[in-house]
């Protein structure tokens, strides 16, 4: 068994070097590091934590479990389950700016009950529903860049065989729905 302190030390020492490596290479390097510690599920790029709760924000509460079950009743195909989660969010939610997440409790439950949130809140709800349904999902964060705007943005990627990792941007899906652009809303699922 590896010493966790050694692992933390190595990651701290590697971080500056990894920052200079392309995003793809950095992802591969981290997968190899994590995989070397036995955290891999057997599918390349998927780890146990891609299916687990991660308190305080990714929690399978009774409400989330019931919502996931209701939305996927009679469905066995993981892609269709993910599609139903996306449709629920994009067809029902409204975009609202949120305070800092550390001030919020139970973000996915609150979003599902109040029908509003921002990009990160929608991402957390989609991610939590996917994981609750046994679909590996990972948080993604970066910048949204437009000709006259640059800002932080969050989305999710989820894994379904045989397609591999696919992206979902529920926030842009919500905006597309509100604008009446169904083709664009569909685009933000799986692309």
Region spans (language model):
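Hydrophobic/aromatic-rich core segments of domains that either
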Residues: 121-191
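Active-site rim elements
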Residues: 113-115, 143
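Acidic low-complexity segments
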Residues: 2-109, 113
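Active-site nucleophilic cysteine motif
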Residues: 78-85, 115-130
């Amino acid at each position: 068994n590896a010493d966790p302190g050694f692992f933390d030390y190595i990651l701290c020492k590697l971080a500056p070097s990894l920052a200079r490596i392309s995003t793809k290479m950095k992802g591969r390097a981290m997968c190899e590091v994590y995989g070397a510690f036995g955290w891999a599920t057997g599918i390349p790029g998927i780890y146990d934590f891609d299916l687990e709760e991660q308190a305080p924000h990714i929690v399978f509460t009774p409400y989330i479990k019931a919502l996931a079950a209701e939305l996927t009743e009679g469905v066995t195909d993981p892609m269709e389950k993910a599609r139903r989660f996306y449709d629920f969010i994009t067809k029902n939610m409204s975009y609202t700016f949120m305070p800092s997440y550390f001030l919020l409790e139970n973000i996915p439950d609150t979003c599902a009950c109040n029908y509003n949130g921002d990009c990160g809140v929608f991402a957390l709800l989609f991610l939590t529903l996917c994981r609750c349904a046994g679909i590996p999902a990972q948080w993604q964060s970066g910048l949204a860049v437009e000709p006259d705007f640059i800002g932080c943005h969050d989305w999710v990627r989820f894994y379904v065989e045989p397609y591999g990792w696919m992206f979902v941007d529920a926030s842009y899906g919500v905006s597309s729905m509100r604008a009446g652009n169904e083709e664009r809303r569909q685009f933000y699922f799986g692309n």
